[in-house]
Amino acid sequence: MNAVPDGRSDKPRSVVGVLALQGDTREHLAALTEAGAEAVTVRRLRELEAVDALVIPGGESTAMSHLLREFELLEPLRARLAEGMPAYGSCAGMILLATEILDAGAAGREATPLKGIDMSVRRNAFGRQVDSFEGDIPFVGLDSPVHAVFIRAPWVERIGDGVEVLARADGHIVAVRQGRMLATAFHPEVTGDRRVHKLFVDMVSE
């Protein structure tokens, strides 16, 4: 662990990285800090090696896959996930954490699965940008619904053994957990509700 002391208590804060190649990095950094983590950006291998956990933000999954290869992070990230590093993916991050990506993109520019969570995820399943929507949905483990913002959002079409469904929207799976990995099809980082990030920070400390 690379946890750092928390001045408010004797309990060290987990160092949680946010993959900062593309996507809404700043919003996740703010949410993680408010949830009690030491939040840092990750763009290089040495930065990936220094964190206790990683958030893969929303953005464009094919662009992120390309940049992971360009920055020589794809295989090291896969290896850290296989070793058990906690990870949270929102929207595009959910897509990349899957073992299988449906409608992965044009040949040569496909989104590449990191194989962190045993699930099949369909890209842009809820539609294009103009089909983006938001609403309140129940979330397992939280005492009241979360306000979920869906932007060109995916959904989960298959889950493996050991994957827990945490939320659904319109009958589709939109949040899951497997061990210390978490994924949501929506963007809790943009709403001001920090409960999903707090759930992840608590998972990192387990």
From Swiss-Prot:
Entry keyword set: Glutamine amidotransferase, Hydrolase, Lyase, Pyridoxal phosphate
GO terms (BP aspect): glutamine catabolic process; pyridoxal phosphate biosynthetic process; pyridoxine metabolic process
Catalytic activity: aldehydo-D-ribose 5-phosphate + D-glyceraldehyde 3-phosphate + L-glutamine = pyridoxal 5'-phosphate + L-glutamate + phosphate + 3 H2O + H(+); L-glutamine + H2O = L-glutamate + NH4(+)
E.C. number(s) listed in UniProt: 4.3.3.6, 3.5.1.2
Binding residue positions for L-glutamine: 59-61, 123, 151-152
Active-site residues, record numbering mapped to chain: 91, 187, 189
Domain of life assignment: Bacteria
Presence of the UniProt keyword Lyase in the record: yes
GO molecular function annotations of the record: glutaminase activity; pyridoxal 5'-phosphate synthase (glutamine hydrolysing) activity
Cellular component aspect of the GO annotation: cytosol; glutaminase complex
InterPro entries: Class_I_gatase-like, PdxT/SNO, PdxT/SNO_CS
Cross-referenced PROSITE patterns: PDXT_SNO_1 (PS01236), PDXT_SNO_2 (PS51130)
Pathway info: Cofactor biosynthesis; pyridoxal 5'-phosphate biosynthesis
NCBIfam families to which the protein is assigned, alphabetical: PLP_synth_Pdx2
Family: Belongs to the glutaminase PdxT/SNO family.
Task of the protein: Catalyzes the hydrolysis of glutamine to glutamate and ammonia as part of the biosynthesis of pyridoxal 5'-phosphate. The resulting ammonia molecule is channeled to the active site of PdxS.
Subunit description: In the presence of PdxS, forms a dodecamer of heterodimers. Only shows activity in the heterodimer.
Protein name: Pyridoxal 5'-phosphate synthase subunit PdxT
Organism: Mycobacterium sp. (strain KMS)
Name of the gene this protein is made from: pdxT
